[in-house]
Amino acid sequence: MIRKIVLGLTVAAFACTGAALAQGIKRTPLQKIDFPAGYTTVTAIAEIPAGGSAGRHTHPGVETGYVIEGEGDLMIDGQPTKHLKPGDSWAIPAGAIHDAKVSGDKPLKIMAIYIVEKDKPLATPVP
């Protein structure tokens, strides 16, 4: 019984860590399915307010996306900064530390697809 409580609290702590990351980004899930085996695929709309950033973080799987509105800079550790505008897309390898910062005076709105290891938090903040 105690083990189940400790496990539950540990899972809740990881979930809260992901929520803390969300201070600069709002994710609205559109679909979440357990596919392929051992992974969860999440399709979401993500929005970052003007002047904001997502905060440095990682995902336990790949992220791909498409810019709907606004502009921003995508910084992936070890790669040149990529400026994104409506119609642009990107791919981020599993575990890569990255951040997105809005440029201009409009919010950045994207559609993102995450294929992450099942039962792991969608995002984990890093310093």
PLM feature spans:
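Short acidic-glycine-tyrosine-enriched beta hairpin
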Residues: 48-49, 72, 78-95
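A short, N-terminal "cap"/entry segment at the start of jelly-roll beta-barrel domains
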Residues: 2-45, 75, 83, 91, ...
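Extracytoplasmic
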Residues: 41-43, 59-62, 79, 95, ...
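Ligand-binding loop in jelly-roll beta-barrel domains
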Residues: 95-119
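Soluble periplasmic/extracytoplasmic beta-strand elements of cell-envelope proteins
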Residues: 43, 47, 73, 111-114
